[in-house]
Curated annotation (Swiss-Prot):
EC numbers on record: 2.7.10.2
Gene from which the chain derives: TNK1
Molecular function GO labels: ATP binding; non-membrane spanning protein tyrosine kinase activity; protein tyrosine kinase activity
Phylogenetic placement of the source organism: Eukaryota, Metazoa, Chordata, Craniata, Vertebrata
Residue stretches of biased makeup (Low complexity): 542-552
Identification of the protein by name: Non-receptor tyrosine-protein kinase TNK1
Subcellular location: Cytoplasm; Membrane
GO CC aspect terms: cytoplasm; membrane; plasma membrane
Length: 666
């Protein structure tokens, strides 16, 4: 059975005649695994995979030479098909005992079975198990490695499992990138073993979900990991490969600041004019991470990997929670085709979430490439700052002079850029929260206090207002600290009634599916997606002029003076905010009445958002309601705020009808 499963001889043969691009079509569509199988292949079969007649003649001549040559009876040769066994292994330099050998082609060799000692079990997969191991080089130096062994049954390895195992070997042996897990060599024993680079800190998912007292990962570090991942995926895409299983569980921590892409069992080459791979039959795939075209048609491409990158980004900023938890696999596709999307995690900036939404574009051609994502991530990343004065105000992020601060995003009143409250993470305490911008100085500001919001990225769309984060995203979310790991936000039960833990977007109040936990949905994002295809009227004519939101007070928003009870909506994390209204602060009953009126008029907004909107409009309830609806429509679509205002005006401020209109015309 082993000679039948071996297929690397075919790759070697095709490479010699510059036809390597036909390796996978011949292997998977024509099912050729041995030279004699070509006796049953007709010219029209080769025509069907796009091979021209001159190329067919070259292949025929190469097969004649192969069959006329000496028949090797070596079992190793039959598996590797002409990849010459390299029995000598380079030695480690004596002056650098802590470094792994240099990545040279000769290192990816056949390794004697006795040179590898397996230790503790690290994990298992579909066709193999992974152990920690020790590889003893001929020089006597021992190198820590990971050893992946083929799962063997009572009658030996199954043909499918062996083929998958060897396919993974053939992929990994040609990869060399600082953020891709490296294959050192192959052990041809019983069982077959891959000797790979060891990532001693385990998977990123395990680190994200580690319980206390393990501190959470810093936001700046997560952004670094995203840039490393985008670079590695751009490398795979440039080599014509699609990963198909991109998730935090398959990202390994080689060091505290370095991740490596691993698990190449589902990797396939991209072929054809459309540059995609289509599954030939039912095989297990990670449903919650897959793009709609992968679930509907079994089609995978670099664009579907970009979709998975967006889900992986969501995982990283939600603390490793499972996407679409509680939703049956057969319903995930329906949710995605209804334009439902995972909500913005509390730690994720609006700029990064905007990138995730671009990765989740319904049409693959509308998603950015990985090479483009590298630049976008650099622009959307957080800014580094240093605390210049102690902050001890109630509700604010506590910080001391000299603390390193990562500015996740800055925000200000729409028309009052001088009244700035920023959201960030204290690098000393790992806590996240809001704080006055004047309390920090930016690392690139020459030691001057920061007085205006900072965003290193460029606005993705819409009109740009001075002093706003992400171009024109203007709302100030004071004290918007995320809940502790393992806890959910204290949301009123009546308002949570229609939100499922599976994160699907619903407009009606229905039963909640049960299942694995998920981060609390951001209602503003989830609620605006219609349940079914609406009957849309013609596009309304957009006038050249548009009303502008009411002008807010120019006063700085004061710090709250009274601390509400813990179970009061204002006592929730991220909900404390004193609204500066025209003529001074409203009395508490009057303020609460207006907040309740706004909250009942705009479905899905939070108590804090209503209070912020009233503060920005001087207490005008109608203007606050309209501004919130414009804000929701803006974040749902790719249109500018002025366009959103005019569309809502046309639909008489019916947000549901306006949402259906913009979703039908993205």
């Amino acid at each position: 059975m082993l000679p039948e499963a071996g297929s690397l001889w075919l790759l070697k043969l095709l490479r010699d005649i510059q036809l390597a691009q036909f390796y996978w079509p011949i292997l998977e569509e024509l099912n050729v695994t041995r030279p004699e199988h070509f006796d049953f292949v007709k010219p029209e079969d080769l025509d069907g995979i796009g091979m021209g007649r001159p190329a067919q003649r070259r292949l025929s001549e190469a097969l004649k030479r192969l069959r006329s040559g000496p028949k090797s009876k070596n079992w190793v040769y039959k598996i590797l098909g002409g990849f010459a066994p390299e029995h000598k292994e380079p030695t480690l330099p004596s002056d650098s005992p802590r470094h792994l050998p240099e990545p040279e082609g000769g290192l990816k060799c056949l390794i004697p079975e006795g040179a590898v000692c397996r230790g503790e079990l690290l994990g298992s997969g579909c066709f193999g198990v992974v152990h920690r191991g020790l590889w003893t080089l001929p020089s006597g130096k021992s190198v820590p490695v990971a050893v992946k062994s083929l799962r063997v049954g009572p009658e030996g390895p199954m043909g499918t499992e062996l083929g998958d195992f060897l396919r993974e070997v053939s992929v990994m042996m040609n990869l060399e990138h600082p953020h891709v897990l490296r294959l050192h060599g192959l052990v041809l024993g019983q069982p077959l073993q891959m000797v790979m680079e060891l990532a001693p800190l385990g998977s990123l998912h395990a680190r994200l979900t580690a319980p206390a007292p393990t501190p959470p990962l810093l936001v700046a570090l997560l952004c670094l990991f995203l840039r490393q991942l985008a670079g590695a995926m751009a490398y795979l895409g440039a080599r014509g490969l699609v990963h198909r299983d991109l998730a935090t569980r398959n990202l390994l921590l080689a060091s505290p600041r370095t991740i490596k892409v691993a698990d190449f069992g589902l990797v396939r080459p991209l072929g054809g004019a459309r540059g995609r791979y289509v599954m030939g039959g039912p095989r297990p795939i990670p449903y919650a991470w897959c793009a709609p075209e992968s679930l509907r048609h079994g089609a995978f491409s670099s664009a579907s990997d970009v979709w998975m990158f967006g889900v992986t980004l969501w995982e990283m900023f939600s603390g490793g929670e499972e996407p679409w938890a509680g939703v049956p696999p057969y319903l995930i596709l329906q949710r995605l085709e209804d334009r439902a999307r995972l909500p913005r995690p509390p730690l994720c900036s609006r700029a990064l979430y905007s990138l995730a939404l671009r990765c989740w574009a319904p049409h693959p051609a509308d998603r950015p490439s990985f090479s483009h994502l590298e630049g976008l991530l650099q622009e959307a990343g957080p800014s580094e700052a240093c605390c210049v004065r102690d902050v001890t105000e109630p509700g604010a992020l506590r910080m001391e002079t000299g603390d390193p601060i990562t500015v996740i995003e800055g925000s200000s009143s729409f028309h009052s850029p001088d009244s700035t409250i920023w959201k960030g993470q204290n690098g000393r305490t790992f806590k996240v929260g809001s704080f006055p911008a004047s309390a920090v100085t930016l690392a690139d500001a020459g030691g001057l206090p920061a007085t205006r919001p900072v965003h290193r990225g460029t606005p993705a769309r819409g009109d740009q207002h001075p002093g706003s984060i992400d171009g024109d995203r203007k709302k100030a979310n004071l004290w918007d600290a995320p809940p502790a790991r393992g806890q959910r936000r204290n949301m009123p039960l009546e308002r949570m009634k229609g939100i499922s833990r599976s994160l699907e977007s619903v407009l009606s109040l229905g039963p909640r599916p049960t299942g694995g936990g998920s981060s609390p949905p951001e209602i503003r994002q989830a609620r605006a997606v219609p349940q079914g295809p609406p009957g849309l009227p013609p596009r309304p004519p957009l006038s050249s002029s548009s009303p502008q939101p009411s002008q807010p007070s120019r006063e700085r928003l004061p710090w709250p003076k009274r601390k509400p009870p813990h179970n009061h909506p204002m006592g929730m994390p991220g909900a404390r905010k004193a609204a500066a209204l025209s003529g001074g602060l409203l009395s508490d009953p009057e303020l609460q009445r207006k907040i309740m009126e706004v909250e009942l008029s705009v479905h899905g907004v939070t108590h804090q958002e209503c209070q912020t909107a009233l503060g920005a409009t001087g207490g005008d309830v109608v203007s606050a309601i309209r501004n919130l609806k414009v804000d929701q429509l803006f974040h749902l679509s790719s249109r500018s705020r002025a366009d959103c205002w005019r569309i809502l005006e046309h639909y008489q401020w019916d947000l549901s009808a306006a949402s259906r209109y913009v979703l039908a015309r993205p």
